[in-house]
Curated annotation (Swiss-Prot):
This is Phosphoglycerate kinase. It is found in: Cytoplasm. Its main location: cytoplasm. It comes from Dictyoglomus thermophilum (strain ATCC 35947 / DSM 3960 / H-6-12). Pathway: Carbohydrate degradation; glycolysis; pyruvate from D-glyceraldehyde 3-phosphate: step 2/5.
C-alpha cells in the first residue's frame, strides 16, 4: 500500500501519544441492543495494536443519520460492547470536542481507550468544516483512519482532521485496500464480476472501470431487466430504467468489442405483485407477459452462473440477485453465495451492502476471502476513484 499505516511507525512514535482513530461503529441497534457487532470486531486489531504500544486511544465514529443530538443515537451501547470485546474499560465521553473532552483526554494513561460521542451530532462533521476539524485535531498527536466504510466521504473526521495532524491508515483500512487493490491490479484469471441490485445507474462506474480488467460479467437483480429490455425483450412490470436503455446497449457492445463475456439471465422467478405470499412461477426471459414482475433469477440462470463461478479464480460480487429480503425471492442470491463458497480455488470479494447482509444471513461469511465493510466506499473503489479518506493520509 502506497500510504503509511500504523505498521510503518516506530513503537516510540506511539508510546504515550494521543491517537485519534476514526472507526466505523455504525452498527444496527434495536432497543439499546446491538444486533450485529461485526464492525466493532473488525476494528479490534488496530485498537489492540495501539493499546499494546502504550498509545492513548481516542475513538471517533458516527452512528445513523442524526438530526442534531439524539439520545437514541448516543454511542453508549457501542462503548459497552467494545469494552466486553477488549476486556478492559472503554470510557464513553458525552461530546466530541471542547473543554470537558480535553480534560478527560489529559487524564488518560498509556493504553487507555475512550470513545467520543456520535460525531454526526455536529452538522460541521459532514460539512467538513475546517474549524471543527481543527478542534478534533487538537485532541491528538496522530490521526489513524480505520473506517473504510466512510472513506468515500470527505468529512471532518474522515479527511479534514488530517490537514492538521499526521494521518496514517489502520489495519482494517490497509486490508480493504490491499485485497481489493490486488484484485484490480493483478488478478488471478478467469476474473469475473457478479453484479445485482435494482439499478444499472448505481453500477455504471463499476462496469466501465472493470470492463478493461475482467473476463466476464454475470448480471442479475433488478438491473437485468434494463439490459433485457434494451435487447428488445418484453419485461412486463419489472423494474426498468427507461432512460438507461441506450447506455445498456452501449455497455453490451463494449463488452462484445473487448471479448468480455456479458451473461444475462435465461429465466426468472415471476409474480403478478410483490408481496410475501405471492404465487410465483418460473419463466424464460422471452416469455414474459405485460403484467409479469421479475423478482429473482431462475434455475437455468443459477446453473449457468454456477458453472462460470466454479471456473473463476477471482470473483467480485456486488448486489443481490433478487429481492432477497422476501424469503420466496432469495433463492438466486443464496445459490450464488453457495456457489462462490463452494469454489475453494478463488479469491472472492464481496462489496459490502446488501450482498454482505445476504451472506451473513446465510452464515457463509467464513467461506469468502473478503467481505468489505463499506458498501458505497467499495463501489467507489471499484470505480477506480481515489477515496478522500485515503488521499489525505501520509505517503510512504
Amino acid at each position: 500500500m502506497a500510504k503509511k499505516t500504523i505498521l510503518d511507525l516506530q513503537d516510540e512514535e506511539l508510546k504515550g501519544k494521543r491517537v485519534l482513530v476514526r472507526v466505523d461503529f455504525n452498527v444496527p441497534i434495536k432497543n439499546g441492543v446491538i444486533t450485529d457487532d461485526r464492525r466493532i470486531r473488525e476494528a479490534l486489531p488496530t485498537i489492540k495494536y495501539l493499546i499494546d504500544r502504550g498509545a492513548k486511544v481516542i475513538l471517533v465514529s458516527h452512528l445513523g443519520r442524526p438530526k442534531g443530538f439524539q439520545d437514541d443515537l448516543r454511542l453508549d451501547p457501542v462503548a459497552k460492547r467494545l469494552s466486553e470485546l477488549l476486556g478492559k474499560p472503554v470510557k464513553k465521553l458525552n461530546d466530541c470536542i471542547g473543554e470537558e473532552v480535553e480534560k478527560e483526554i489529559s487524564n488518560m494513561k498509556e493504553g487507555d481507550v475512550v470513545l467520543l460521542e456520535n460525531i454526526r451530532f455536529y452538522k460541521e462533521e459532514e460539512a467538513n468544516d475546517p474549524e471543527f476539524a481543527k478542534k478534533l485535531a487538537k485532541l491528538a498527536d496522530l490521526y489513524v483512519n480505520d473506517a473504510f466504510g466512510t472513506a468515500h466521504r470527505a468529512h471532518a473526521s474522515t479527511a479534514g482532521v488530517a490537514q492538521y495532524i499526521p494521518g496514517v491508515a489502520g489495519l482494517l483500512m490497509k486490508k480493504e485496500i490491499e485485497i481489493m487493490g490486488k484484485a484490480l491490479e493483478s488478478p488471478e484469471r478467469p476474473f469475473i464480476c457478479i453484479l445485482g441490485g435494482a439499478k444499472v445507474s448505481d453500477k455504471i462506474g463499476v462496469i466501465k472501470n472493470l470492463m478493461t480488467k475482467v473476463d466476464g460479467f454475470l448480471i442479475g437483480g433488478g438491473m437485468m431487466f434494463t439490459f433485457l429490455k434494451a435487447l428488445g425483450y418484453e419485461t412486463g412490470k419489472s423494474i426498468v430504467e427507461d432512460d438507461k436503455l441506450e447506455l445498456a446497449k452501449e455497455i453490451m457492445n463494449m463488452a462484445k468489442e473487448r471479448g468480455v463475456e456479458f451473461l444475462l439471465p435465461k429465466d426468472a422467478v415471476v409474480v403478478k405483485e410483490i408481496k410475501e405470499d405471492a404465487p410465483t412461477s418460473i419463466k424464460d426471459v422471452d416469455k414474459f407477459e405485460k403484467d409479469d414482475i421479475g423478482v429473482d433469477i431462475g434455475p437455468k440462470t443459477i446453473e449457468l452462473f454456477r458453472e462460470e463461478i466454479l471456473k473463476a479464480r477471482t470473483i467480485i460480487w456486488n448486489g443481490p440477485m433478487g429481492i432477497f429480503e422476501i424469503p420466496a425471492f432469495a433463492n438466486g442470491t443464496r445459490r450464488i453465495a453457495e456457489a462462490i463458497a463452494e469454489n475453494k480455488n478463488c479469491i472472492s470479494i464481496v462489496g459490502g451492502g446488501d450482498s454482505a447482509a445476504a451472506i451473513q444471513m446465510l452464515g457463509l461469511e467464513d467461506k469468502f476471502t473478503h467481505i468489505s465493510t463499506g458498501g458505497g466506499a467499495s463501489l467507489e473503489f471499484l470505480e477506480g476513484k481515489e477515496l478522500p479518506g485515503v488521499a489525505v493520509l501520509q505517503d510512504k
